Amino acid sequence: MTGLPSIEIQPVISGIDSPGSAVERPVCVCFYVFFPAGGIGRYTNELARALGARSDVEVEVACTPDFQWAHDPGYRTWTGLRSISHPIPLLRRFRFLQAQFANPVRFLRRAVNAGTDIIHFANVNHLSFPYWRRELEESGLRVAISVHDVKRQKPILNKAWEEHQLKAVYRIADALFVHSAYQADELVTYAGVARDKIHIVPHGPYPHGHVAHDAADVRKRLGLPLDRQVALFFGQLRDEKNLAGLIRALPLSKNRPHLLVAGEGGGAHRGADFYRDLARKVGVADRVTFLARYIPDEEVGELFAASDWVALPYSNSFTSQSGVLNIAAHYERPVLVSSSPVLHETVRRSDIGVACDGDEPGALAAGIDQLCTQVMNNYSYAFAQYRQQFSWDENARLTSEVYRRMLLAKPRRISVGGGTSVGLTV
């Protein structure tokens, strides 16, 4: 909007490493989590716990009342976001769309009232960004975003509109956190953001508790072979995870591993019945076991412990880090990855599995044979080094350093309501 006065907000650095400061105080950070559960929620929970254990950061997580980790003692929660859950699909969809508009506004007002220094989006409601953008700009809050997926695989309503708004959200942020060099480059190319706003932080391992039952007992209960390697494909069945390519690779492999598929489909993605039919068509139905349901946390560790290795045959359109890979690292199970760029980069760097040359069945079969041979020969994978390099404490250390620089940065001018507004140069 033309004719608006220019606005400049100075960084609030009193008591935070500013010259002549007598007293240091923690940086006050409020996270925004839109979904009540899932991978991003778990990531935010682990990061908030690691940050909350530090003396230089004070953490609050703004979430829905049914957020799975709302009562975690490692940080403070504010459960004032509108819930998107409902047993009736149509009403759940309505709540989801309603919350796209309501929750960012609720969050921003909470952050301002709580005296927050930095807001950190675990999710961004880019669909409704024009609705809450002015409230964000006028708040004067510093903005950080965890970018788990640079692009969205599927639109909510309109792809062109949503891509435009997503890029706008990225550009208004003061700091963007990614998990790989590939994602950093992708973000620069996609949204045109400055490279110095992007910070690479590790995605830590996901613990799922103690394994109560012996691996052999779990295999017997699930009808899995005791005399053959078992590969685990775990998580939601999504098309870009390339389970079809993995099943087609099984008859091409010189080894004969058994595949356990644990998880269910969702939305417009193909479900378990499609993959059962495919296994029959390629002649490996007797070598694939389906556990086609939601897997509760208390069962996750058992499935990983009962498996010899974990299959992540994701296609190159899958450009985020994988929570499944980090569960595998926790339970010290090597992984098979294909051409998914972030996973390929991670495994090449850390020696915790085999990175295939592509995601087509032939390349996957070659990778399967290589990994089966390594497992059979008791290959020593670098899990200890991985857990040290990709730890939550290291993530929190790097993240807190960025927070400090955000508070000390010189203000930059961006648009307010179409004219000029505030941001920071980090």
Name every feature range the model reports, one short phrase each.
Residues 272-298:
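Nucleotide-activated donor-binding/catalytic signature segment of Leloir-type glycosyltransferases, i.e.
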Residues 302-319, 333:
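Acidic donor-binding loop of glycosyltransferase active sites
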Residues 13-15, 185-189, 196, 204-221, ...:
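Acidic anion/phosphate-binding donor-loop and adjacent secondary structure
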Residues 210-224, 275-277, 376, 380-381:
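A short helix/loop element that forms part of the nucleotide-sugar donor recognition site in Leloir-type
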Residues 65-68, 205, 258-276, 293:
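Glycosyltransferase donor-sugar binding loop
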Residues 100-108, 119-141:
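An aromatic- and histidine-rich active-site surface loop
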Residues 225-241, 247-250, 259-260:
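Conserved donor-binding/catalytic core segment of Leloir-type glycosyltransferases
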Residues 6-7, 12-15, 33-38, 49-102, ...:
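N-terminal strand-loop element at the rim of the active site
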